[in-house]
């Protein structure tokens, strides 16, 4: 079955092409740390031959606690992104939370991301669609895979069909997430075979019911990522940090930066194997 290709500059993203890595840090903690993390990702992905897009947030507007670190903000964040692009020649993905942010962010980065908690907000979707940028839609934890076609349709109505879908788990009772591996193929089907990627970092979140920040299951990142890659996906979304225990956001789910290369070697091996298989239709 023909898969839709979404191009991020010279990077082609599709379910039947070699996977693209969307990776970096959860939030911009500082200019220097962003440079360090980006350089490491670029070095490793170039060595392994993996297409790469750097990820970081300039503002985490959905933190659990009013006291949690949010990021440097729009103006300073865009300056850091511009420096990363100039220094490393890297493509960049970041999220927007308000319609007014869409165009200023799209003027700097290569992919703008619709956060899971906001994925049904039509005004935000319309503003993002109008930019003409490549869009990454995070599937809300409370939305079934089959409902993602409606969100894609909103972007199409806004004149933008350059849409990537991203699964980051589904609510499983209170304060826990699980990943439905059957959901990936459903998301492909309802979106006209748009690229589907897997955010393994945020799928590992597991909250303390009474805590002010998300917990996580970093020790299980490799197992969960292996399972997702075995489905046959367009890309993998992974955040890493040189010192996860002291990261300002989602450290418990972050991959230790020093483990990035061996981790990606495994992901590439699985991706190469799965995409070497002939398509097998078992529906009839």
Curated annotation (Swiss-Prot):
Compartment(s) where it occurs, according to its Swiss-Prot or TrEMBL record: Cytoplasm
Family of this protein: Belongs to the KdsA family.
Reactions accelerated catalytically: D-arabinose 5-phosphate + phosphoenolpyruvate + H2O = 3-deoxy-alpha-D-manno-2-octulosonate-8-phosphate + phosphate
Protein name as it appears in the record: 2-dehydro-3-deoxyphosphooctonate aldolase
A GO MF term: 3-deoxy-8-phosphooctulonate synthase activity
GO BP annotations listed: keto-3-deoxy-D-manno-octulosonic acid biosynthetic process
Keywords, ordered alphabetically: Cytoplasm, Lipopolysaccharide biosynthesis, Transferase
Taxonomic placement: Bacteria, Pseudomonadati, Pseudomonadota, Gammaproteobacteria, Enterobacterales
An example Gene Ontology CC term for this record: cytoplasm
NCBIfam families, per the entry: KDO8P_synth, PRK05198.1, PRK12457.1
Enzyme Commission code: 2.5.1.55
Disulfide pairings: none
Organism the protein comes from: Escherichia coli O6:H1 (strain CFT073 / ATCC 700928 / UPEC)
InterPro entries: Aldolase_TIM (IPR013785), DAHP1/KDSA (IPR006218), KDO8P_synthase (IPR006269)
Presence of the UniProt keyword Transport in the record: no
Tagged with keyword Cytoplasm: yes
């Amino acid at each position: 079955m023909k898969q839709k290709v979404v191009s991020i500059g010279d990077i082609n993203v599709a379910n039947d092409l070699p996977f693209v890595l969307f990776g970096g840090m959860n939030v911009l903690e500082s200019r220097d740390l962003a440079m360090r993390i980006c350089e490491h990702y670029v070095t490793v992905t170039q060595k392994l031959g993996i297409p790469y897009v750097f990820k970081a947030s300039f503002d985490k507007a959905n933190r659990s606690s009013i006291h949690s670190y949010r990021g440097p903000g729009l103006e300073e964040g865009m300056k850091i992104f511009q420096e990363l692009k100039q220094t490393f020649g890297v493509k960049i993905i970041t999220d927007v939370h308000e319609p007014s942010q869409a165009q200023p962010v799209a003027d700097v980065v290569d992919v703008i991301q619709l956060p899971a908690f906001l994925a049904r907000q039509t005004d935000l979707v319309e503003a993002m669609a109008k930019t003409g940028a490549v869009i990454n839609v995070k599937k809300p934890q409370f939305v079934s895979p089959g409902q993602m076609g409606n969100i894609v349709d909103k972007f199409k109505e806004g004149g933008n069909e350059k849409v990537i879908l991203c699964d980051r788990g589904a609510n499983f009772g209170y304060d826990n997430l699980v990943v439905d591996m059957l959901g990936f193929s459903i998301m492909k089907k309802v979106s006209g075979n748009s690229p589907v990627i897997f955010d393994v970092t945020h799928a590992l979140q597991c909250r303390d019911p009474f805590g002010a920040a998300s917990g996580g299951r970093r020790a299980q990142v490799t197992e969960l990522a292996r399972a997702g890659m075995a489905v046959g996906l367009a890309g993998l979304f992974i955040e890493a940090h040189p010192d996860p225990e002291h990261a300002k956001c989602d450290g418990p789910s972050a991959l230790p930066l020093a483990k990035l290369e061996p981790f990606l070697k495994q992901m590439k091996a699985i991706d190469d194997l799965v995409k070497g298989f002939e398509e097998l239709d078992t529906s009839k």
